[in-house]
Amino acid sequence: MLGDLFTKPKKRKYATIPSDGTKADVPEGIMTKCPECKKIMYTKELQKNLMVCNYCGFHHPIGAKARIDMLVDEGSFEEIDASLTTANPLGFEDYMDRIEKDKQKSGLNEAIVTGHATIDGNPLVIAVMDSRFRMASMGSVVGEKIFRAVEDADKTNKPFVIFTASGGARMQEGMLSLMQMAKTSAAFKRFSNHGGLIITVMTHPTTGGVSASFASLGDYNFAEPGALIGFAGRRVIEQTVREELPEDFQTSEFLLKHGQLDDCISRLDLQNKLSFILSIHVKTPEVGGEADGE
């Protein structure tokens, strides 16, 4: 009996089943990995949360039309100037090929979508830049669409809300691209002089000529958390000033801390915030007559 305690355990036998070489296919896009916290989540759950990570709050990129759908009242959006597209004014080699690829990738004709809509019944003109199209760089068409949208807001006496996301001026259009900085800024100024309300919401990334022109000209200047906002790149600035910059330099949190933003708002709270601001700025007719449309 004692000998049984010291007997060697019997080895288990395992059978090897040959593989046929095939792998179970997981449908593409069903899961998304957060680049910030590295957690993996169902894409549908991420979309339900407005593309904001459930674990760390990272704001994933979102297309222009998807952003409009999540903000405005259902069925209220009426797009304007949707057919405008660049004509390659400088004859830049392969520029139109790149434009066509971006059209197919994004489903847009240009890097911005503009139109009329309502948020909780409050009317507005809205413009949303889309970084999938030439990194939302500002060329002549982008500048023209912003200009026309602001003019529409002025004529219809509606607030103007713009979401920025851009790599800057579009180099393939040269000076015509740079001219849009002055053109859009002048339109903002004229609208402001007429008493119009402008709200800018800077998203990741808002850089270059866009950040240096209309992006910060709103009556309210907001940003999404973690957005990169600045003119020149971090490395260029460090080499110029010969100083090491803070870790959070050029982030929306850094700008808020230094008084360059009015607020840093989560995408989850943005609709309520905009609705409240629009509601308190509604222009009502004056007693005994209509309000001055100028």
Curated annotation (Swiss-Prot):
GO terms for cellular component: acetyl-CoA carboxylase complex. SUPFAM superfamilies: ClpP/crotonase (SSF52096). Residues 30-294 form the CoA carboxyltransferase N-terminal domain. It is found in: Cytoplasm. This is Acetyl-coenzyme A carboxylase carboxyl transferase subunit beta. One of its GO terms (biological process) is fatty acid biosynthetic process. The keyword Magnesium does not apply. The gene is accD. Pathway: Lipid metabolism; malonyl-CoA biosynthesis; malonyl-CoA from acetyl-CoA: step 1/1. A zinc finger (C4-type) spans 34-56. The lineage of its organism: Bacteria, Bacillati, Bacillota, Bacilli, Bacillales. Keywords: ATP-binding, Cytoplasm, Fatty acid biosynthesis, Fatty acid metabolism, Lipid biosynthesis, Lipid metabolism, Metal-binding, Nucleotide-binding, Transferase, Zinc, Zinc-finger. It catalyses: N(6)-carboxybiotinyl-L-lysyl-[protein] + acetyl-CoA = N(6)-biotinyl-L-lysyl-[protein] + malonyl-CoA. Zn(2+) binds at C34, C37, C53, C56. It is an enzyme of class 2 (transferase). Its EC number is 2.1.3.15. HAMAP family: AcetylCoA_CT_beta. Its main location: cytoplasm. Component of the acetyl coenzyme A carboxylase (ACC) complex. Biotin carboxylase (BC) catalyzes the carboxylation of biotin on its carrier protein (BCCP) and then the CO(2) group is transferred by the transcarboxylase to acetyl-CoA to form malonyl-CoA. GO terms for molecular function: acetyl-CoA carboxylase activity; ATP binding; carboxyl- or carbamoyltransferase activity; zinc ion binding. It comes from Listeria monocytogenes serotype 4b (strain CLIP80459). Acetyl-CoA carboxylase is a heterohexamer composed of biotin carboxyl carrier protein (AccB), biotin carboxylase (AccC) and two subunits each of ACCase subunit alpha (AccA) and ACCase subunit beta (AccD). Belongs to the AccD/PCCB family.
